[in-house]
């Protein structure tokens, strides 16, 4: 599998609550980059 396919498979297996946490972490990282 390509790395993109593996990432999609891994993301599909992550519960919605963890997806939300990952989204929050990404937002925090983006904000930290701007500060």
UniProtKB/Swiss-Prot annotation:
Record note on pH: Optimum pH is 7.2-7.5. Poorly active at pH higher than 10 or lower than 5.
Annotated EC: 3.1.-.-
Sample GO molecular function, one term: hydrolase activity
Stretches for region Disordered: 1-35
Alphabetically ordered keywords of this record: Hydrolase
Bias type Polar residues, positions: 1-28
Domain of life per record: Bacteria
Function: Highly cationic enzyme that can bind human or rat immunoglobulins as well as serum albumin, and could therefore be involved in post-infectious sequelae.
Name assigned to this protein: 30 kDa neutral phosphatase
The species this protein was found in: Staphylococcus aureus
């Amino acid at each position: 599998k390509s790395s993109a396919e593996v990432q999609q498979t891994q993301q599909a297996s992550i519960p919605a609550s963890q997806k939300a946490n990952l989204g929050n972490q990404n937002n925090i990282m983006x904000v930290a980059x701007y500060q």
